C-alpha cells in the first residue's frame, strides 16, 4: 500500500511539473524572419492545394486565403496581387481542424519555404494570429534593415 501511495504521489508531482513547464502559446516567440524579405512589397496569397478560385479547393483553405488577404490589406504594409508573377513573396496557407499553416516563399525561386508558422485556429476569419506573427517578423526585419 505504501508503495502504491509513493508511486501515485510521484506521478502527480511529475504531471504538475510538466504542466507548469509547458510553453504559454500567447507568449511564444515569433520564428526568425529572413532578412532577404525586408524589401518585399507585393504578396500573392494561395493555398498548397490551389488558388483562391480553384473549384476543387477546400472551403477552409478558401476562407483562410480570404482571411490572410483581409488581414494584410488592413495592415497596409504589403500590396496584394492576384498573379504570382507580380509578387515578391508568396504566402501559402492550409487550414485544417487540427492545425493551420502559413508559409512564406520567394516568388522568384521555387525552393523550400523561407519562413513558416503553424497553430490551431490560426487563420480564422476576423482573427488571424499566424498573420500577426508574420507581421511582427516582417516589421522586425524592416526595423533591423534601417
Indicate where each model-derived feature is located.
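A structural "domain/chain start" motif
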Residues: 20-74, 85, 114-119, 139-146
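Positively charged n-region of N-terminal signal peptides that target proteins for export
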Residues: 1-4
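A broad, structure-centric signal for solvent-exposed, well-ordered loop/edge residues
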Residues: 8, 52, 87-88, 111
Amino acid at each position: 500500500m505504501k508503495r502504491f501511495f509513493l508511486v501515485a504521489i510521484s506521478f502527480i508531482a511529475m504531471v504538475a511539473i510538466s504542466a507548469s513547464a509547458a510553453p504559454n502559446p500567447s507568449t511564444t516567440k515569433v520564428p526568425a524572419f529572413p532578412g532577404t524579405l525586408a524589401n518585399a512589397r507585393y504578396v500573392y496569397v494561395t493555398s498548397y492545394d490551389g488558388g483562391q478560385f480553384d473549384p476543387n479547393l477546400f472551403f477552409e483553405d478558401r476562407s483562410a486565403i480570404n482571411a490572410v488577404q483581409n488581414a494584410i490589406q488592413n495592415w497596409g504594409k504589403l500590396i496584394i496581387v492576384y498573379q504570382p508573377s507580380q509578387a515578391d513573396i508568396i504566402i501559402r496557407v492550409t487550414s485544417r481542424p487540427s492545425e493551420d499553416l502559413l508559409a512564406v516563399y520567394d516568388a522568384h525561386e521555387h525552393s523550400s519555404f523561407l519562413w513558416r508558422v503553424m497553430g490551431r485556429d490560426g487563420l480564422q476569419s476576423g482573427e488571424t494570429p499566424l498573420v500577426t506573427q508574420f507581421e511582427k517578423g516582417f516589421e522586425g526585419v524592416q526595423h533591423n534593415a534601417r
